[in-house]
Amino acid sequence: MNQEQLNEYFAHKWKSNLSQYFYCGWNLIDNICDDEWVLDVGCGPNLFKGKIKNLIGIDPAYDEADYKVTIEEFKTEQKFDVAFCLGSLNFGSHDKIISEISCVVNLLKPDARIYWRSNPGRKDHRHKDCKQIDFFPWTFEHHKEFSKQFGFECVDLRWDSNHRIYAEWCRTT
């Protein structure tokens, strides 16, 4: 699926349900301080908007996003304390994932965190068109490798509900 097809799928066939996740759902709000700026990458219908004080949501498929763009298209001088990548950097090849992570990392402050929900390649959405999506097969090892590659430490890594991987990456100066 190309980006246009992914946008169509996520805007019209997939439904967000943060309540089904323990670590990488609504509980993430408790990890954010009032003065921190959060970039929600692939925010979908921007469900954290209004619940996190300083939040910018980007998503190429949803009008509810603050910016309707991909992570590669998003440009700003602002640097963020935290990024949410909750099911958004899950599509395409190893090289595409690396490129997208690089875009996220370049938008972060030196002392930053990234919270992840990663799909280990499961085509288990409730819509038949899901079978056509090129899911990247995330593993715990990918999180360890990529976090180190980008100067982060993977400080939390575990299975969350619905067969998804929860990870927290931290970078300190």
Regions found by a protein language model. Give the residues of each.
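Short catalytic micro-motifs in class I SAM-dependent methyltransferases
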Residues: G87-F91
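A short glycine-rich, Lys/Arg-flanked "PGG" loop and its adjoining helix->strand segment in the class I
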Residues: I98-P110
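Class I (Rossmann-like) S-adenosyl-L-methionine-dependent methyltransferase catalytic domain
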Residues: M1-F74, R113-T173
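A conserved beta-strand element that flanks and buttresses the S-adenosyl-L-methionine
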Residues: F84
